[in-house]
UniProtKB/Swiss-Prot annotation:
InterPro entries recorded: Hist_DNA-bd (IPR000119), Histone-like_DNA-bd_CS (IPR020816), IHF-like_DNA-bd_dom_sf (IPR010992), IHF_beta (IPR005685)
Keywords for this protein: DNA recombination, DNA-binding, Transcription, Transcription regulation, Translation regulation
Cell membrane recorded as keyword: no
Record family assignment: Belongs to the bacterial histone-like protein family.
Subunit structure: Heterodimer of an alpha and a beta chain.
NCBIfam families: hip, PRK00199.1
Protein name listed in UniProt: Integration host factor subunit beta
Organism: Rhizobium leguminosarum bv. trifolii (strain WSM2304)
Pfam families with a match to the protein in the record: Bac_DNA_binding
One MF term in the entry's GO annotations: DNA binding
């Protein structure tokens, strides 16, 4: 699913809202999540999951085309941990081993 499909589904479930308003709401939610992550904050959507950022330290890497060793700088990467309810919907009937 892409963002425009999400907007269409939400708009169809909420016929009292204009399509452009739904698009603005979806964009606002995504912008707020992005801004929070950029500020180093964690975003938790209970039952769905939690977004956070993790630090990847600098390391030596290898250029797959040439085989040369290259230096990869430290960077921050987004991370998503699924919530219990989402895991249960994806794997119905399985006991949750993490919690």
């Amino acid at each position: 699913m892409i963002k425009s499909e999400l907007v269409q589904i939400v708009a169809a479930r909420n016929p009292h809202l204009y399509h452009r308003d739904v698009e603005n709401i979806v964009n606002a939610v995504l912008d707020e999540i992005t801004d929070a992550l950029a500020a180093g904050n964690r975003v938790e959507l209970r039952g769905f999951g939690a977004f956070s950022v993790k630090n990847r330290p600098s390391r030596s890497g290898r250029n797959p085309r040439t085989g040369d060793t290259v230096f990869v700088e430290e960077k921050w990467v987004p991370f998503f941990k699924t919530g219990k309810e989402l895991r249960e919907r994806l794997n119905p009937g399985q006991a949750d081993e993490e919690d």
